[in-house]
């Protein structure tokens, strides 16, 4: 059921003292809920995730397929079964109409641009969407301003994880046009990992000390863009200032 894809961080920022504790967390993307059958699938996913005992979960967007309030609420209910904190960011499909994210804001308040800390690590969740657009997008001025205002408040020496919906890896399909403007703001920080969605497929790219990844989708009624069939999520371990991760495949439910 598990297929391994371990990767070590390559470098550590000079002079940084890694946190002493280690912990695990899950990363899931592109669940695209659009019917009750998707709810049964997502509950199955959550039960498999519970076996891995992560301390929290990151969902990097496209929770639902068409931004409906009732679908977002259903995803919230399914994810609550994990019994652990779930931190999400908005995907383009989580908008109801081109620029309307009101349903997402109502169901998941304060989940646009934000930070949290865990085990000596810093986590930054960002909105990289351009409304409903899926290609040739730009990261909003509002997000870039938020980064400018809040990134200096973080400890540049402590390890940091960035999670956001649109793929930021160099050359990955649907990468926002102004990704470099965002990444340049993180160059002086101890960024160790970047988790993205939107492109349904496994990609891995370097950025300074970090590895930037996308993953296969974890949706019942959506496929992968890279032609693969596997659905699943990452289980990640933060230890000694580095991140490792492995892919947990979710098999189809019995007929």
Feature-to-residue mapping (PLM):
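Cleavable N-terminal signal peptides
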Residues: 3, 13-14, 143
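Short, solvent-exposed loop/turn segments at secondary-structure junctions
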Residues: 67, 169-175
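Extended active-site neighborhood of metal-dependent phosphoesterases/phosphodiesterases
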Residues: 17, 69-159, 178-193, 203-239, ...
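N-terminal active-site segment of His-dependent metallophosphoesterases
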Residues: 7-74
